[in-house]
From Swiss-Prot:
Name of the protein in question: Cyclo(L-leucyl-L-leucyl) synthase
Record GO terms (molecular function): aminoacyltransferase activity
UniProt family annotation: Belongs to the CDPS family.
Chemical reaction(s) catalysed: 2 L-leucyl-tRNA(Leu) = cyclo(L-leucyl-L-leucyl) + 2 tRNA(Leu) + 2 H(+)
UniProt entry keywords in alphabetical sequence: Transferase
Pfam families the UniProt entry points to: CDPS
Described purpose of this protein according to its UniProt entry: Involved in the biosynthesis of pulcherrimin, a red extracellular pigment. It uses activated amino acids in the form of aminoacyl-tRNAs (aa-tRNAs) as substrates to catalyze the ATP-independent formation of cyclodipeptides which are intermediates in diketopiperazine (DKP) biosynthetic pathways. Catalyzes the formation of cyclo(L-Leu-L-Leu) (cLL) from L-leucyl-tRNA(Leu). Can also incorporate various nonpolar residues, such as L-phenylalanine, L-leucine and methionine, into cyclodipeptides.
EC number(s) given by UniProt: 2.3.2.22
Subunit details: Monomer.
An annotated GO BP: pigment biosynthetic process
Active site, per annotation: 37 (nucleophile)
Record's keyword annotation contains Transferase: yes
InterPro entries reported in the protein's UniProt record: CDPS, CDPS_sf
Length: 248
């Protein structure tokens, strides 16, 4: 594709805050961190354009969060050789970045405000938050099981996306793929410290079971007071999913 499509249809998004504190952060609309997943057909160029357009209209400042190199673990867990998995992730994240940059430029945002998990490996705030997550993972069985459950869902979802039949998900597969979950969690509990912003909301298109448990104080780790989570869904997609559910 050589250039941006100049005409886009009007679209509406519905935003739902995870907690009352998240709602209060949303009302102030200072900053949002838009999460974009790799290997997810939802995140087409048009969808990213619409989503970032909505975010830019709602918030004073918009940043975008893309996957890091840990995404290769998910592919490797499904049998892709490590080198090939890393190449596929680099290609996919580059595609996501390109679409996000175009959308930010088109809507008057900052095209440099795009980050991957891996960008913060040497960031002190990220390191501390990740250490907190890893400590809970190894010391609290119920938290570890919740993380591995998310890992299982990701493996099954990716397998379904490539029409791969999964008879079972082994422990080795889970332990390999869970690195992605661990790498992402610091942005769920304390992204403002990492990004050096006053407060933010991590925005994604669906509820996060692990995040709901964290917000319900089921584990030692918790969301910082200036951190929130926002479920952002496109009206057209919601109506389509509702129609499929009612017909099915």
């Amino acid at each position: 594709m050589t250039g941006m499509v100049t005409e886009r249809r009007s679209v509406h998004f519905i935003a739902e805050a995870l907690t009352e504190n998240c709602r209060e952060i949303f009302e102030r609309r200072r900053h949002v961190l838009v999460g974009i997943s790799p290997f997810n057909s939802r995140f087409s160029e048009d969808y990213i354009y619409r989503l970032i357009g909505w975010a830019k209209a709602q918030f004073k400042s918009v940043s975008v969060l893309l996957a890091g190199h840990e995404a290769a673990n998910l592919l490797e867990a499904l049998g892709t050789p490590r080198g090939k998995a890393e190449r596929k992730v680099r290609k996919e994240v580059s595609r996501n970045r390109r679409f996000a940059e175009r959308a930010l430029v088109a809507h008057g945002g900052d095209p440099k405000a795009i980050h991957t998990f891996s960008d913060f490996i040497d960031n002190k705030a990220y390191q501390l938050l990740r250490q907190e997550v890893e400590h809970a993972f190894f010391e609290q069985p119920h938290f570890r099981h919740a993380c591995l459950d998310m890992s299982r869902e990701a493996i099954i979802g990716r397998a379904r996306g490539v029409s791969l039949m999964m008879e079972e998900v082994s422990e080795d597969m889970l332990n390999l793929a869970v690195e992605y979950v661990i790498a992402e969690l610091p942005f769920f509990i304390g992204a403002p410290d990492i990004l050096e912003v006053e407060e933010t909301l991590l925005a994604y298109h669906r509820p996060w079971k692990l995040g709901e448990k964290i917000s319900n104080h089921e584990f030692s780790i918790c969301m910082r007071p200036n951190q929130g989570y926002l479920i952002v869904q496109e009206m057209a997609q919601m109506l389509s999913e509702k129609r499929i559910t009612s017909e099915g």
